[in-house]
């Protein structure tokens, strides 16, 4: 009798275990759809993608091609109407394609808006001279002959500030800094900015208007970079990266001053800017653990 009762108890326990297992399996198969979608990567906002494809609907108020409010009314900054956000949005799109989704996607709008911030009169416009938006890699000076501020120094400073802020847990502040930094990265990829050619002594404004109008013709093949670009970003100091980019930009100064070669100069400048901004953001991401 004792053996029979033990067998009955064991059989009952096995049945209960089977029922529980069945419930678990049913629960897994009937898991709500949101439990799957919650794990899906966050894509870039549609507006960022639209800007990268040439939409004029940019984030924020933007910055005018010519700063008519400027007391001097002579200087024009490097990132104008749509060009800066076009460059940054393409960099973010490429990073998403090559490295996958990250917090940069959810903060993409902020980065895009802050890339225009330094061009808004009164923010970081150097009393209307925009001197700190220039950087000649051969002299290390801006158009006023000063070693500081320059586009290189500001891009480096914002990079370090972004790293420190992110590591301290201030994600939004870090994205603000990296956004502002990308402005100067783009500036020093523009031939006039890398040659200290202002709107007073050159065709600076005319060339930038041309580039802004034709920006959608200047793209990165496949919206992707090879591993060598990312390896270079990881293994090159920020300052050295910016110096090299400015050297390449300065080499295009002659072409950028000749209307017959505007298109070639614009194409190379914008492509180089997208690449350098991508490397700048990627290096930041690697240093703080985003990638």
Where are these regions (language model features)?
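Short alpha-helix carrying the canonical HExxH Zn2+-binding catalytic motif
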Residues: 174-186
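Short alpha-helical segments used as structural interaction elements across diverse proteins
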Residues: 10-13, 81
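Short, Lys/Arg-enriched N-terminal segments with co-localized hydrophobic residues
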Residues: 1-11
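N-terminal, motif-rich segments that launch catalysis or mediate targeting to/interaction with membranes
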Residues: 34-176, 191-291
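Sec-dependent N-terminal signal peptides of Gram-positive bacterial secreted proteins and lipoproteins
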Residues: 15-35
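Intrinsic disorder/low-complexity segments enriched in polar/small residues
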Residues: 7-9, 17, 41, 47
